[in-house]
Amino acid sequence: MADIYFVGLGLSKRFLTNASLEVLKGSDVIYADIYTSISCDINEKTLREITGKEIIPATREVLETKEKEIYKLLDSGKNVAIAVVGDPMIATTHVSLATGARARGHRVSVIPGVSVHCYMISRSMLSSYKFGKSVTVTFPVLDKLDYTPYRVIKTNRELGLHTMVYLDLKETGIMTADLALNYLKKMESDIGDKVILDDDLVVIGERLGCADERVRAMKVVDALNQKFGAPPHIIIVPSRNLYEMEVEGLKCLS
């Protein structure tokens, strides 16, 4: 019997917890999924430096194809860590690997990390109880937009809820907040249900957890013409029915 750990690295080195670092240093093999989410200062090199161990880079897709290899390491008595930027089980789900390891008699542990989801809610000062389903704006495929984000925001609006909007991340490019809003405006133009209007508020986070992070509240029309810093970015589309304290909180971000 061996241990497999799913380790949250947080958003940057200053959010890497002692618990996570202790587990990484005590593991025999470390796979690092540092591609599904981006950090300003956590990469293979920094992980090698802080753990003193070799790091095996792996995307989520690579981990899925290497499940048998990981199980083989566990079966041989090696303790394995899967290190993930942010939190290991919120945005990037490795449940299949965890349940497979447990079925083979190995111990499974999750070491949570500071996730972009929780961080952005806290920085926005919006009520955490009023968040509905989250959604991702993706790059068009063969010039076709996926209208799921528009539908999710519409449903959340009808329920008086906020929407956390993640932005697509691919090897070919990282989506920025202004591009995502342009896609949402295109969806609005195509569907016309008045879900994304120029005067609607959005909260935009840039490089969360990093020294140069910014979180700002602004109208959609202003965001479309805004020059944002380097990614990663994330967007909250607030409910149109804000509590008085939420309104006051958003003033701190303008």
Curated annotation (Swiss-Prot):
Residues that, per the record, bind S-adenosyl-L-methionine: 11, 87, 90, 115-116, 167, 208, 233
Gene3D superfamilies: Cobalt-precorrin-4 Transmethylase, Domain 1, Methyltransferase, Cobalt-precorrin-4 Transmethylase, Domain 2
CDD domains tied to this protein: DHP5_DphB
UniProt entry keywords in alphabetical sequence: Methyltransferase, S-adenosyl-L-methionine, Transferase
GO molecular function, one term: diphthine synthase activity
GO biological process: methylation; protein histidyl modification to diphthamide
Pfam short name (any one): TP_methylase
Pathway: Protein modification; peptidyl-diphthamide biosynthesis
Entry EC number(s): 2.1.1.98
Keyword Transferase in annotation: yes
Reaction(s) this enzyme catalyzes, per UniProt: 2-[(3S)-amino-3-carboxypropyl]-L-histidyl-[translation elongation factor 2] + 3 S-adenosyl-L-methionine = diphthine-[translation elongation factor 2] + 3 S-adenosyl-L-homocysteine + 3 H(+)
Subunit structure, as described in the record: Homodimer.
Family membership: Belongs to the diphthine synthase family.
Job of this protein: S-adenosyl-L-methionine-dependent methyltransferase that catalyzes the trimethylation of the amino group of the modified target histidine residue in translation elongation factor 2 (EF-2), to form an intermediate called diphthine. The three successive methylation reactions represent the second step of diphthamide biosynthesis.
Protein name per its UniProtKB record: Diphthine synthase
Phylogenetic classification of the source organism: Archaea, Thermoproteota, Thermoprotei, Sulfolobales, Sulfolobaceae
